[in-house]
Amino acid sequence: MYPAHLLVLSAVCVSLLGAANIPPYPLNLINFMEMIRYTIPCDKTWGHYADYGCYCGAGGSGTPVDALDRCCYVHDNCYGVAENKHKCNPKTQSCSYKLTKRTIICYGAAGTCGRIVCDCDRTAALCFGDSEYIGAHKNIDTKRHCQ
């Protein structure tokens, strides 16, 4: 191997080692976005669901406006159980899963944080795929509609 190749290989390895110290915060969000993209219609992106209804996005209050918003309500509650009952941190918890044959398979032992969070995300993503997206419910006035 040429010295230049060794130099490049070394630089790549050092870069990868440095990347291993990146906090896992975005990892679960990336996993969840990937699950959503797998289950929703092609003309939508996960961003369509980020500020939808009363519960899709940050926070949530009131009564869900439709079936899709109920998916987010259930997901929020699932994360709440993961945090309060199981002492998991859903936003930073990595998980193992497989996208196959129009479904999502979560791996890991039942009751572990990775599996609990994966099951929350899987259920929500499949629910998104089964629910109608109503454009009028995107960016609604939550002070008016979500009391």
UniProtKB/Swiss-Prot annotation:
What InterPro entries does UniProt report for this protein, alphabetically?
Answer: PLipase_A2, PLipase_A2_Asp_AS, PLipase_A2_dom, PLipase_A2_dom_sf, PLipase_A2_His_AS
Sites binding Ca(2+) sit at Y55, G57, G59, D76
One BP term from GO = arachidonate secretion
Where in the sequence is the active site?
H75, D121
Stored SMART domains: PA2c
Please give the GO cellular component terms listed in this UniProt entry: extracellular region
The cofactor remark states: Binds 1 Ca(2+) ion.
Keyword Nucleotide-binding assigned to the entry: answer is: no
A Gene Ontology molecular function term of the record: calcium-dependent phospholipase A2 activity
- Cofactor(s) the protein requires to work: Ca(2+)
Q: Name one Pfam family in it.
A: Phospholip_A2_1
Q: Which CDD domains match?
A: PLA2c
Location relative to the cell:
Secreted
Q: Which UniProt keywords apply?
A: Calcium, Disulfide bond, Hydrolase, Lipid degradation, Lipid metabolism, Metal-binding, Neurotoxin, Presynaptic neurotoxin, Secreted, Signal, Toxin
Which positions carry the propeptide annotation? 20-27
Listed as disulfide-bonded, the cysteine pairs are C54-C146, C56-C72, C71-C127, C78-C120, C88-C113, C106-C118
Q: Give the EC number.
A: 3.1.1.4
Its main subcellular localisation, reduced to a broad class, is: secreted
Catalysed reactions, as listed in the record: a 1,2-diacyl-sn-glycero-3-phosphocholine + H2O = a 1-acyl-sn-glycero-3-phosphocholine + a fatty acid + H(+)
Q: Which family does it belong to?
A: Belongs to the phospholipase A2 family. Group I subfamily. D49 sub-subfamily.
Q: What does this protein do?
A: Snake venom phospholipase A2 (PLA2) that inhibits neuromuscular transmission by blocking acetylcholine release from the nerve termini. PLA2 catalyzes the calcium-dependent hydrolysis of the 2-acyl groups in 3-sn-phosphoglycerides.
PANTHER family attached here?
A: PHOSPHOLIPASE A2, PHOSPHOLIPASE A2 FAMILY MEMBER
| Subunit and interaction comment | Heterodimer; disulfide-linked. The A chains have phospholipase A2 activity and the B chains show homology with the basic protease inhibitors.
Entry protein name: Basic phospholipase A2 beta-bungarotoxin A2 chain
Species per Swiss-Prot/TrEMBL record: Bungarus caeruleus
Show the taxonomic lineage.
Eukaryota, Metazoa, Chordata, Craniata, Vertebrata
